[in-house]
């Protein structure tokens, strides 16, 4: 998502090598399988699956891999998909909090791996609910900067398109585009309203948004960033969200 966005998740600013790309593919395939299992194989009727497929395509996952993942997840191949979704809460220092979103087939392995990284970083895992109140779950739709006719979008045009779809906010991104913030349950209605108005969007995503952000001096800031990067390397981790603000933090 746009680097000008105020909705901060973690974006790592370094090249992705082949090994990391393969790991990312595996995570995205897992996300598709779980979404298909939960809501069925129809993208039009399953916003979670549509979001997972869109994210996979954005990261160049081959269409054949995506199709097979949908079939596996929806039970069409007879394979058993047994992943669970978990969110771990991490207390850092000076008011910094993190939510680590995981998708795993082994809770014990997942928890042990997260705890090891967090402890090495001088931070701690806390009980569910201890820090989650610092964040809200939100859906974000990133728009193209032009409509289907090639005209630059205006905020009035976007607003009129989604007026009935119950959005929370429309945020200019600084590159002539906009982001629409909405409740996750309203994402399907928002996307349908945009399509009906001829407005194209780049991505749809559900994220944890901090209620407020915290700044740290450089040394402590770098420690948090290193921990986040280590967490993102875990096979079980789907996303890391924090209330820390800084140069390395931007929406995907």
Swiss-Prot record:
Domain of life where this protein originates: Bacteria
One cellular component term from this protein's GO annotations in UniProt: cytosol
Main location: cytoplasm
Molecular function as annotated in GO: DNA binding
Keyword Nuclease: no
InterPro entries from the UniProt entry: Integrase-like_N, TACO1_YebC-like_2nd/3rd_dom, TACO1_YebC_N, Transcrip_reg_TACO1-like, Transcrip_reg_TACO1-like_dom3, YebC-like
Keywords of this entry: Cytoplasm, DNA-binding, Transcription, Transcription regulation
The keyword Magnesium appears for this protein: no
GO annotation terms (biological process): regulation of DNA-templated transcription
Subcellular location: Cytoplasm
The family this protein is said to belong to: Belongs to the TACO1 family.
Record-given protein name: Probable transcriptional regulatory protein TWT_266
Species, as recorded: Tropheryma whipplei (strain Twist) (Whipple's bacillus)
């Amino acid at each position: 998502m746009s680097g000008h966005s105020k909705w901060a998740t973690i974006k790592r600013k370094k090249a992705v090598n082949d090994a990391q790309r393969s790991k990312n593919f595996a995570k995205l395939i897992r996300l598709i399988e779980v979404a298909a299992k939960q809501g069925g194989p129809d993208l039009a009727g399953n916003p979670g699956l549509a979001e997972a497929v869109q994210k996979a395509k954005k990261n160049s996952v081959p269409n054949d891999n995506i199709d097979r993942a949908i079939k596996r997840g929806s039970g069409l191949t007879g394979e058993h998909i047994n992943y669970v979704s978990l969110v771990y809460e991490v207390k850092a220092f000076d008011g910094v909090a993190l939510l680590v979103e995981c998708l795993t087939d082994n809770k014990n392995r997942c928890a042990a791996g997260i705890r090891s990284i967090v402890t090495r970083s001088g931070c701690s895992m806390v009980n569910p609910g201890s820090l989650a109140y610092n964040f809200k779950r939100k859906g974000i739709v990133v728009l193209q900067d032009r409509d289907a006719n090639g005209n630059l979008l205006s905020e009035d045009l976007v607003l009129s398109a989604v007026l009935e779809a119950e959005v929370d906010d429309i945020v200019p991104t600084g590159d002539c585009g906009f982001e629409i913030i909405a409740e996750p349950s309203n994402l399907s209605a928002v996307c349908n309203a945009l399509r009906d108005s001829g407005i194209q969007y780049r991505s749809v995503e559900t994220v944890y948004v901090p209620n407020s952000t915290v700044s740290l001096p450089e040394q402590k800031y770098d420690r948090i960033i290193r921990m986040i990067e280590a967490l993102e390397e875990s096979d079980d981790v789907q996303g890391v969200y924090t209330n820390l603000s800084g140069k390395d933090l931007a929406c995907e």
